[in-house]
Structure formats: C-alpha cells, structure tokens
Amino acid sequence: MLGKARELANYQDEPEQLPTGSFGKNAFLRLGFERRPERTVLATLHRRAPLIVQQALYWDEGMPTLPCVSIISNAGGILQGDRYAIEIDLEPDTQAHVTTQSATRIQEMDANFATQTQTITLGANSYLEYIPHPIIPHKHSRFVQQTEVTIHPTATLIYSEVLMAGRKYYGTGELFHYDLFSSKFHAAHTDGTSLFTEKFIVEPARGNVSRLGAMGSFHVFGNLILLTPKTHADRLFETIDPVFDMDEGIAWGASRLPNDAGLLFKVLGMESAPVRAAIRKIWEAARQEVTGASLPENFLWA
C-alpha cells in the first residue's frame, strides 16, 4: 500500500477537513485505447472527480490518427489526504498521447499527505507519449507517486516528469520549502520480466538539496524515460551529447537503461521553459525514430 511507504511514517495524522480518501479526494481515471481500421480510439473512459477527461481529440498534424487526451482536475491542485489513481491501457498496434491541462500544484499541507498511483500497460507494437505539465510542490506539501509499467518488448513509451523547486516567484520565493516529494517508476515486460526500478526521494529539510551531486544551483529537474526496442535506443543514444552550460543555466545527459530497456534522459535548469524544451527535443527525436512522424510546432500558450 502506497500510504505505508517508509518516507510517510511522520505524516499519518488525519486532516481536520474531509477524511483521507473520502468523496472528492479519491480520484480515479482509466483510459483504454483500441485500434479501429482508420485510427486509434479512446474506447474506455472511466473517471471519478476531481480527475476528468472529456474525450480524445485529433489535433496533432504530425500524426493525424493519434488520439490526444488532456487530463483535467477540477480541484485546483492536489490537497492533503488526496488519493489519485490513473490507469492507461494500450491494446496492440495502438498509439496515444496523454498530457495534463496545466501544471499540477501540490497545495500546502498541515496534516497527512497525498498519493498518486499510475498503472500503464502497452501491448505489442503500441506507442504512448505521456508528457504531463510540470509538478509544483507548495510549502510543506508531501506527495508520493508510484508508476508501474507493463510493456511488450515491441512497444514504446515516452514518459516525462518535470519537478519545480516550488513557487519560485511567490512572495519572497519558495525554493525547496516542501516537506517530501517521492517518485518511484518500475517497468516490466508483459511476461513478468523486471526491467528496472528508479526511485528518488527529496526531503529538503533533511539534507541540502542545493549541494553538489543533487540540484546544485539549479531549480528545475526534468526526467524522461524512453522504453523502446534496443535498435531505436541505440540510434537515439548516439545523437545525444551531454551539456553543462552555466551561462544558459542548463545541463543534461542521457544513459542506457538496464536490460536493454531504453534510455534515461535527465535535465537540470533554472526555469521550466528550457527544461521542457530539452525534453521536447528528445521526445521529437524519439517520435521520429519510432514512428517516422514529425512533432508539430509547440502551441504558443504551452
């Protein structure tokens, strides 16, 4: 059970408001994609507020048959005691793009914590881009996320997350004022073979996040996980050169994942825009390599 994670031991008190996981605080979303003769469709949609999806749209000019889904929240952010669950299922030979409507704000907390579980399943020759907007943890927030991926060896997943240091320009600034941010990602093949696990726990009060070897002088952390067949990963890896440019306030690098699972790309920056641009560059290259399709120009408001 995610709420029993060791890093949450000090945050088991109940909120004075709505109880943990009660109505309005136990969001659920299930997206099931299936192949039709002309395109992939969002065939299954189960939702429980505050997570909302209305329908799939086909706005991607580079891949006109790609269903694009935006996850919306009507809660104004993630609150203490919230328990979110997201399931994404791609049948064989399907393609999908999933994102969020805007940044995910983890609101200030004085009791308990919030969790989100993500379960992603990709069938043979399927392709998923899961590119949410940044996560902004507010002062004293506590958030734990666990992502479980089951992927066929012929499928591809482009998964990203961008973690802000907090509300950088709020008042005098909130840089690393949150209590806890924990994220675990585990991937396995459909036959049950475990590929790798990555977990990072950030507790600013317990250690200097700005030290060398952690964030250093940077304020934004970007993480892109590319699960794809080895031939794709090998070609992409050769095109990614490491960068460390303090004048521009950006640094990135790529490494290979264990068991020929794919690539891991990490980027640090001072602001979210350059970090997201670096992730978009790898996303674009991966899409071109795997599907042969181009990425459309970014929206002006993105």
UniProtKB/Swiss-Prot annotation:
Coiled coil: none annotated. InterPro entries: UreD. Keywords: Chaperone, Cytoplasm, Nickel insertion. It comes from the Bacteria. Signal peptide: none annotated. GO terms for molecular function: nickel cation binding. It is found in: Cytoplasm. GO terms for cellular component: cytoplasm. Its main location: cytoplasm. Belongs to the UreD family. UreD, UreF and UreG form a complex that acts as a GTP-hydrolysis-dependent molecular chaperone, activating the urease apoprotein by helping to assemble the nickel containing metallocenter of UreC. The UreE protein probably delivers the nickel. Required for maturation of urease via the functional incorporation of the urease nickel metallocenter. Disrupting the ure2 operon has no effect on urease activity, or pathogen survival in BALB/c mice when inoculated by gavage, but confers slightly enhanced resistance to low pH killing in vitro. This is Urease accessory protein UreD 2. It comes from Brucella suis biovar 1 (strain 1330).
